[in-house]
Amino acid sequence: MSTKEIVKNVNIKNKKASFEYEFLEKYEAGIVLKGTEIKAIRMSKASISEAYCLFDNEELWIKNMNISSYDKGSFYNHDPLSARKLLLRKAELKKLFMHSKEKGLTIIALRLFTNERGYAKIEIALAKGKKLYDKRESIKSKDNEREMQRIRI
């Protein structure tokens, strides 16, 4: 890609994540992709709503991230649900590895985006699942905020 070419900013969010989880720490990670995968991401043909991360041989992998097939890829296309390696610093990987072993904590994908250089990045978070009453509480607070906005206008 030339430097003069304008890159469309991609911003794919996991909307269910903030409702179902409480985020403890957030990280920005690079993704190891094949050629047709990055082209499909730039066309916003990806979904991270079912994605989760796990460790394999001290490497962080994301599973269940759906990157649809690229239309013009012919037989060079990729597998839409294959596992993809995430790139983080060693200190961050060690910290995540230690915390992910704790009971009740998981690593989930929050947002898939492209940076100003055109590289695909993913925002992940160390998260703890919310209880049912926590979910009800967050719904009530959102309703109250909407009511306050209506009153102000």
Curated annotation (Swiss-Prot):
GO biological process: trans-translation
CC annotations in GO: cytosol
Main location: cytoplasm
Subcellular location: Cytoplasm
Keyword Cytoplasm part of the UniProt annotation: yes
Gene3D superfamilies: 2.40.280.10
Keyword Cytoplasm belongs to the record: yes
Key words of the record: Cytoplasm, RNA-binding
Protein origin, superkingdom: Bacteria
Gene Ontology terms, MF aspect: RNA binding
Function: Required for rescue of stalled ribosomes mediated by trans-translation. Binds to transfer-messenger RNA (tmRNA), required for stable association of tmRNA with ribosomes. tmRNA and SmpB together mimic tRNA shape, replacing the anticodon stem-loop with SmpB. tmRNA is encoded by the ssrA gene; the 2 termini fold to resemble tRNA(Ala) and it encodes a 'tag peptide', a short internal open reading frame. During trans-translation Ala-aminoacylated tmRNA acts like a tRNA, entering the A-site of stalled ribosomes, displacing the stalled mRNA.
Family: Belongs to the SmpB family.
Protein name per Swiss-Prot or TrEMBL: SsrA-binding protein
